[in-house]
From Swiss-Prot:
Coiled coil start-end: none
Name of the featured protein: Succinate--CoA ligase [ADP-forming] subunit beta
Protein's pathway: Carbohydrate metabolism; tricarboxylic acid cycle; succinate from succinyl-CoA (ligase route): step 1/1
Any one cellular-component term (Gene Ontology): cytosol
Oligomer and partners: Heterotetramer of two alpha and two beta subunits.
Swiss-Prot/TrEMBL catalytic activity: succinate + ATP + CoA = succinyl-CoA + ADP + phosphate; GTP + succinate + CoA = succinyl-CoA + GDP + phosphate
Molecular function GO labels: ATP binding; magnesium ion binding; succinate-CoA ligase (ADP-forming) activity; succinate-CoA ligase (GDP-forming) activity
Binding site for Mg(2+): 191, 205
Gene name of the record: sucC
Length: 389
């Protein structure tokens, strides 16, 4: 789960990371009141979970509360890369002397953590990594040890901080590691981390991604979820405990097991090249149980996506036998009734497959087409989706 900047700022503050004052506002009037409370120069910052806010006009300096009112009026409701701005943060203005960069993230490829640090912050880190990779220090972090004082000292030295700054920056890095570890984050990023005119090190902007698999350890994290910003279909699937991710294609996908579903996405994308370049519309893993209720919930979510033109159900019977899956499909179609109005291609294999196919053949539902193989099913689903475009 990605946090808004103001949520990351509050989390930083709770762990002792030095930050400046910041107040979230949902209306121009609230923004003006926040600017008056903070006093002096403030910055009106659009709160969206996407980069490029400044270039899009979503970050403005306000020299007075009236200017904060004016800027927030213009920013609220703005569209930034498909994200509507529903709130702004009024942040205390900073006297910036230098800008730096720091992040720590889960490095899945190497099965550990990775810290990245640079004395050249404030710009797109991807651009810096490409144009001047030597300016970005990358330090592997042993998960069993984490970032201790010695590792923090190593990071600031590798990044090239001046000797007199290393102690201060290392202290902030230790606190940011505390956020990463204790909040079960997969990413903690500060860009920029700044030195003020007074010589203080302050986290001026923050990005935090939390591991949703660790939510059971953090009851308070549920309060951080922005229901309004969530995709409605993903929110609906989550409410029904379905593993669903919305994509941009036309072929709805249902499978059992993440590996099989990911393989199905690839096969459908390949088949789509011969049928109008249609693509998968989603990832949906119904897991080991394929009861009528689970299948109905999955189909209900997928058929609620207006982009979907056909559905490919690809199931390998294991613990859950194919006859149970077939009964689930028939029951789901009966339960959904007229809302099930798009063609389904079903491929079954594995445990009790013949009985499963018999059940579907006897049901003889007009929307259901049986496929013998995954390739055949993907091709048929892509063909049907293209015909309905």
């Amino acid at each position: 789960m990605d946090l808004f900047e103001y949520q990351a700022r509050d989390m930083f503050e709770a762990h002792g990371v030095p930050v400046l004052a910041g107040i979230v506002a949902y209306t121009p009037e609230e923004a003006k009141a926040a600017a008056e409370k903070i006093g002096g120069v403030t910055v009106v910052k659009a709160q969206v979970k996407v980069g490029g806010r400044g270039k899009a006009g979503g970050v403005k300096v306000a020299k007075s509360a009236d200017e904060a009112l004016e800027h927030s009026t213009n920013i609220l409701g703005m569209d930034i890369k498909g994200h509507t701005v529903n709130k702004v943060m009024i942040a205390q203005g900073a006297d910036i002397a230098e800008e730096y960069y720091f992040s720590v993230l889960l490095d899945r490829a190497n099965r550990n953590y990775l810290a990245m640090c640079s004395v050249e912050g404030g710009m797109e880190i991807e651009q810096l990594a490409v144009e001047r990779p030597e300016a970005l220090a990358k330090i592997a972090i042993d998960p069993a040890v984490g970032i201790d004082q010695a590792k923090a000292d190593e990071i600031v030295a590798a990044a090239g901080f001046a000797e007199e700054l290393r102690g201060k920056v290392a202290d902030v890095i230790l606190k940011l590691w505390d956020v990463f570890k204790k909040e079960d984050a997969t990413l903690v990023e500060v860009n920029p981390l700044v030195k003020t005119g007074a010589g203080d090190i302050v986290a001026l902007d923050g990005k935090v991604s939390l591991d949703e698999n660790a939510e059971f350890r953090h009851a308070k994290h549920a309060q951080l979820e922005d229901k309004d910003a969530a995709d409605p279909l993903e929110a609906k699937a989550k409410a029904q405990d379905l593993n669903y991710v919305k994509l941009d294609g036309e072929v709805g996908i249902i499978g059992n097991g993440a590996g099989l579903v990911m393989s199905t996405l690839d096969v459908v994308a390949y088949a789509g090249e011969n049928h109008g370049n249609v693509k998968p519309a989603n990832f949906l893993d119904i897991g080991g149980g394929a009861s009528a209720e689970v299948m109905a919930a999955g189909l209900d979510v997928i058929l609620g996506d207006e982009q979907v033109k056909s559905v490919f159900v690809n199931v390998f019977g294991g613990i859950t036998a194919c006859d149970a899956v077939a009964k689930g499909i028939v029951g789901a179609l009966a339960e959904l009734g007229h809302t099930a109005n798009k063609p389904l291609v079903v491929r079954l294999d594995g445990n009790n497959v013949e009985e499963g196919r018999r059940i579907l053949n006897e049901a003889n539902h007009p929307l259901v087409t049986l496929a013998a193989t995954m390739d055949e099913g993907a091709d048929k689903a892509a063909e049907l989706a293209n015909a309905a475009k």
